Amino acid sequence: MTKVLVLYYSAYGHIEAMANAVAEGAREAGASVDIKRVPELVPAEVAKAAHFKLDQAAPVAKVEDLANYDAIIVGTGTRFGRMSSQMANFLDQAGGLWAKGALHGKVGGAFTSTATQHGGQEMTLFSIITNLLHFGMVVVGLNYGFAGQMGVKEVTGGAPYGATTITDGDGSRLPSENELNGARYQGRTIAETAKKLHG
């Protein structure tokens, strides 16, 4: 059975919701899916004062976990047009796996959130995808088979590089059904691709 890891960092729960949708899509394709989060780097008292969502069910990942999967789908909120420091710190620790070629040929993908429509979604996706390519992974985005990214009648996330959501500046906007459907579609597509490559 194809093994998929949905690896994420979520400060306020938006990416957690997207991660769950990505996992749903991968499971629809018959994959075995684990959802794990990267460690929080912000001191507990600061995170609490900033109202971070600290009650997330997903277990904390270990870097060595990455080698155990056929596909790894990475999600994090945007920080000034790039991935969060929490995710960058985690991926930076995968140098040993990189040196051994342990991630070569695995399928990867990225998803993200921003506060605004033009808040750096594509740049953040590229910052994740760059890491995946350096690891030797095969990257799968959110292709235009997902028609939900084609319309202009509603404010919505989604790009050919990966599923996205828009949170609003105060974080009050939760992922829309269309954005969650995009995440499901990407998760399903990545799982299907991994199955074709890895059996």
From Swiss-Prot:
Binds 1 FMN per monomer. Keywords: Flavoprotein, FMN, NAD, NADP, Nucleotide-binding, Oxidoreductase. One of its GO terms (molecular function) is NAD binding. GO terms for cellular component: membrane. It comes from the Bacteria. FMN binds at residues 10-15, 78-80, 113-119, 134. Substrate binds at residue 98. Its EC number is 1.6.5.2. Transmembrane segments: none annotated. Residues 4-190 form the Flavodoxin-like domain. Its cofactor is FMN. Pfam families: FMN_red. It catalyses: a quinone + NADH + H(+) = a quinol + NAD(+); a quinone + NADPH + H(+) = a quinol + NADP(+). NAD(+) binds at residue 12. Belongs to the WrbA family. PANTHER family: FLAVODOXIN-RELATED PROTEIN WRBA-RELATED, FLAVOPROTEIN-LIKE PROTEIN YCP4-RELATED. This is NAD(P)H dehydrogenase (quinone).
